[in-house]
Each structure stands twice: as structure tokens, then as C-alpha cells.
Amino acid sequence: MTMNSCADNSTKTNEADAVLENIFNRKSVRSFTSEPVSEEHIETMLKAAMAAPTAVNYQPWRFVVVTDRAQLDAMAEVLPYAKMLRQAPLAIVVCGETTWFDGKENPYWQQDCSAATENLLLAAEALGLGAVWTGVYPNMELAGPLGEFLGLPETVQPLCAIPIGHHDGTTKPRDKWKPENVHYGKW
């Protein structure tokens, strides 16, 4: 084994440790300071979201970035489970194009946009920001009004709204490992 291969293995181990630490430290943060999120951080989170896997590389995700205080407050009225929007300086609404190239229904947009959402949440954690996934779709009592509020085209559905901001660090990650939920070979 050469010195370079040892260094390469060490680097890969350190990178793997950093990735896993970020995953295990991710938490749902519902309380934010008023400090704005930089445009650089917003772009980094969006780039991470768009790096998600996607069926046939269709990339159906669309994002609505909301930083206007009045609009965030109004969104909190539209989404009863997202009252923390009143504190958050930023929300990113993850939406999906529900049709394929040929106009037929895209049955994978929810999966693709969910993967993008998780990447966005992990990027927020890596940047030292707090965020929480607030579900919207498939509840049309939420998706319909939010889509109208945001002026979404007919073929675009809001999957979730992600309030994002700086936090005080009091929210701690939870250990969600439950071996009884794992089955090998068959149920």
C-alpha cells in the first residue's frame, strides 16, 4: 500500500464520517431568529436539492423562494401546520411538475421532489441552519390554496413548504434507529 492510497482512504473515511454526522444531526427546527439567510446559502441549498436522483433524469422539481415578511406571514395562514413561518426569514416551497414531456401524468414527481427536499434539509444542516419539512401534498385542502397563493401553473403541485433560518441550537437531533423495523430477506 502506498502513502497516497493511505491518504486517499483516510480522506474517504473523513468524508464519510462528515456525511453521516450531518445526516444523524439533522433535526426539525421550528423556532428561528430574525437573522436573514444569505443568498449564497439559499443558492447552495437549491443546488443540493437539484443534485437529487430523479426518474429518467426528468428533474420535475420547481422551487418558490419566499423571503418577504408579509408573504411568509400570509403563508402561515394558508398552512395551519406551518405557523413557524411567522418567525422564519425564509421558506422554500418544493413543487413538482406533474406531467411528462408528452403531457401524460408523471407518477414519480413526488418521489423525485421528496429526494430533493431531503437534500435541501441536509444542506441546511450542513450550513448551520435550521429547517423543517411541512407537508402539503397530497392534502388538496392545503395544496390547492397554497398553489393559488403562489400562482403556480396548473401542472405544478406544491409538495411541501420548508421554513428555514438561523436557530438558537436548543433543538437536538433524535435517535430514530429501531432495529425492529428492519427485516432481512422477507417480512
What residue spans do the PLM features occupy?
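Acidic, surface-exposed loops and disordered segments
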Residues: 1-187
